[in-house]
Amino acid sequence: MHQLRFVPPRQRGIDPVGEAEVYLTYQRYKRARQVLRHTIQNEPDNLPAHILLLHTYYLLESSQDYCQLASKLQGRLAHRPEWAHICHVGRSLAPEYPLFQQSMH
């Protein structure tokens, strides 16, 4: 089976977060990761893409990537309702990671 060339969703008139959600629904986690990473590279302020990428890292059990991205996003998300969930999930992936321990206090 040959690899299809990646064409960014925006170039096809498609919302990248929506496309990644479809990939996640069908357990195509690596494809969702590819879409979201490309989106964030080109749209660094796309917060929904960042949050969905965190979820994708969780599904891939990629604790290092999850921790790095959560650390990067802490300043933007710490006062939002999503942050408590991000830390809860983070503790399940990396219970020893200090960032997620701080949120318990």
Predicted segments — roles?
Residues 48-49:
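Structured alpha-helical
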Residues 55-57:
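Conserved short loop/turn motifs at secondary-structure junctions
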Residues 1-31, 38-42, 64, 69-105:
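Intrinsically disordered, low-complexity, charge-biased linker/tail regions
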